UniProtKB/Swiss-Prot annotation:
SUPFAM superfamilies documented for this protein: Nucleotidyltransferase, PAP/Archaeal CCA-adding enzyme, C-terminal domain, PAP/OAS1 substrate-binding domain
Enzyme class: transferase
CDD domains attached to this UniProt entry: NT_2-5OAS_ClassI-CCAase
Keywords: ATP-binding, Magnesium, Metal-binding, Nucleotide-binding, Nucleotidyltransferase, RNA repair, RNA-binding, Transferase, tRNA processing
Positions with a binding annotation for CTP: 53, 56, 146, 164, 173
GO terms (BP aspect): RNA repair; tRNA 3'-terminal CCA addition
Name of the molecule in the record: CCA-adding enzyme
Residues reported in the UniProt entry to bind Mg(2+): 65, 67, 124
Family stated for the protein in its record: Belongs to the tRNA nucleotidyltransferase/poly(A) polymerase family. Archaeal CCA-adding enzyme subfamily.
Subunit: Homodimer.
A Pfam entry, by short name: CAA_C
Catalytic activity annotation: a tRNA precursor + 2 CTP + ATP = a tRNA with a 3' CCA end + 3 diphosphate; a tRNA with a 3' CCA end + 2 CTP + ATP = a tRNA with a 3' CCACCA end + 3 diphosphate
Annotated binding of ATP, by residue: 53, 56, 146, 164, 173
Gene designation: cca
Length: 485
């Protein structure tokens, strides 16, 4: 198929039909009305706005997320607007037969699930202030301005839908910490800036590199002296891309995007442009592996893998997931300091969000029992030389004048070191780089798992079966692009 034939086919797929449009927009009107009626009783000066892709008409078929913002005058106290929003949001969701729950991001808000004509909608009711563009009291105050900007500047909503479908299919959609991908707003801004989905892909392949700056409103030359100043401003983020928020030049819309996801997007874009196919919009989700396949893989695998089970804290994923990744990185450093070479690490969780898992892969599972240790030169400070000699006894002097010896290695297998974590207290876990909440919840609960135990987990929990499939088989994107690059 030609590029245009593929895009024509996908344009039809990503555009909601009239029946679905009436379903989604009809529900949005209902929840908006329920919230508005209750909010006006409590604060006549507050307003209600529908926010997000449904409001901006960039949602994909199957959409189930509806975001409602309660917008308050700036003179209201934050605790007051949160309390009012929690009340009206809970009442509105329950009035439609749904279940409400209190959530927390920058401040508390109400989330919930509501059944409507056979579809379950995820509803968020969020408080914010009525601010001017660029004025921020709370981080979510920008969001209504994002709505207005997209509505005013996005000429063809289907181009944003194409981009969203593309990044969703390659598992790069969403700014949450587990994904570190492209938010919906970022997709919309890219469609505005480049004019079309195809042009986004072509420019990504041609120009996107870590630190590349996208400036929709010409802030460079007005707010910033040059592009170097932009990069300096955001250097603490170590950004994959810098997309200056049109409503707030001090914010990088792409701050959540990781270099891994940037690379995956460029690979997918290059492969799609070279050999267009509808497959790029339909995704290749890994099927859960069976326990039998896990056993077989571990028997045949030439490398060495250690699996560690921890107990997750009772926190939202955005809190515990970065701590799980931090733990994997920290343990890798601890192991490397002892001479082990960690080739890669992988983290996953069970479907109940009770346990997390760190998989560490080594090229070799055993080190020599003796290790070479090089000490100071003989002419350096006396205490350093004395310390080395007294610690090791026998030594020789190398050609460059440094003292050297060989000593018995403290840890021969990675399990020798990691085994200290089993049943360990909080302080020991913290000293090995566990995140603070993870160290608290995992105190006395850390276990090293055998291949057999991993196989049993795969059979018991499809979420873990999928995560193990990705670890064992590699990135699903590789199957899509390998014959097209």
């Amino acid at each position: 198929m030609s590029l245009e034939e593929v895009l024509d086919e996908i344009r039809r797929e990503v555009t909601p039909d009239p029946e679905e449009r009436e379903l989604v927009e009809g529900f949005a009107r209902r929840i908006l009305s329920e919230v508005r009626d209750r909010l006006k009783e409590r604060d006549p000066d507050a307003e209600v706005e529908l926010i997000g892709s449904v409001a901006r008409d960039t949602w994909l078929p199957g959409a189930s997320d509806v975001d409602v913002f309660c917008v308050f005058p700036k003179d209201r106290d934050l605790d007051e607007i949160v309390e009012v929003t929690l009340e009206v949001g809970r009442e509105a969701i329950e009035a439609l037969g749904g279940e409400a729950r209190e959530e927390y991001a920058h401040h508390p808000y109400i989330g919930g699930e509501v059944e409507h004509r056979g579809r379950t909608f995820e509803v968020d009711v969020v408080p914010c202030y009525d601010t001017e563009p660029g004025e921020v009291i709370t981080p979510v105050d920008r969001t209504p301005h994002h709505n207005r900007y997209v509505e005013e500047h996005l000429e063809d909503t289907v181009e944003a839908r194409l981009l969203k479908a593309f990044v969703k299919a390659i598992d790069a959609y969403g700014a949450e910490v587990r994904v570190k991908g492209f938010s919906g707003y970022l997709c919309e801004l890219l469609a505005i800036h480049y004019g079309s989905f195809e042009e986004v892909l072509r420019e990504a392949v041609r120009t996107w590199r870590p630190g590349f700056v996208i400036d929709l409103e010409g802030f460079v030359g007005e707010v910033y002296e040059d592009y170097d100043e932009v990069r300096e401003t955001f250097e603490d983020q170590d950004p994959a891309l810098i997309v200056l928020d049109p409503v707030d030049p001090e914010r990088n819309v792409a701050a959540a995007l990781s270099r891994r996801q940037l690379t995956r997007f460029i690979l997918a874009a290059r492969a799609f442009l070279g050999d267009p196919s509808p497959e790029f919009f339909r995704g290749r989700k890994p099927e859960p592996v069976s326990g039998e396949k896990v056993r077989d893989w571990f028997e045949r695998n030439p490398t060495h893998v250690v699996a560690i089970e921890v107990r997750l804290p009772d926190e939202v994923e955005d809190i515990y997931w970065p701590q799980l990744e931090k733990t994997a990185r920290s343990l890798s450093r601890v192991l490397e300091n002892e001479g082990f070479e960690v080739r890669r690490w992988h983290v996953m969780r069970d479907s109940e969000e009770e346990h997390g898992y760190v998989l560490l892969e080594f090229e070799h599972g055993k080190l020599p029992e003796l290790e070479w240790r090089v000490g100071p030169s003989g002419w350096v400070r006396e205490d350093r030389v004395r310390g080395f000699v007294r610690a090791h006894g026998r030594f020789w002097v190398e050609e460059d004048g440094k003292l050297a010896t060989r000593a018995e290695r403290k840890f021969v297998r990675p399990e020798d070191l990691l085994g200290r974590l089993e049943g360990a207290d909080r302080q020991t876990l913290l000293s090995h780089g566990f995140g603070k909440d993870l160290a608290r919840s995992s105190e006395g609960e850390v276990r090293l798992l055998s291949a057999e135990e991993l196989a049993e987990l795969a059979d018991r929990d499809p979420e873990l079966g999928k995560a193990l499939a990705e670890f064992m088989r590699g990135d699903p994107l590789s199957e899509l692009v390998r014959d097209r690059l």
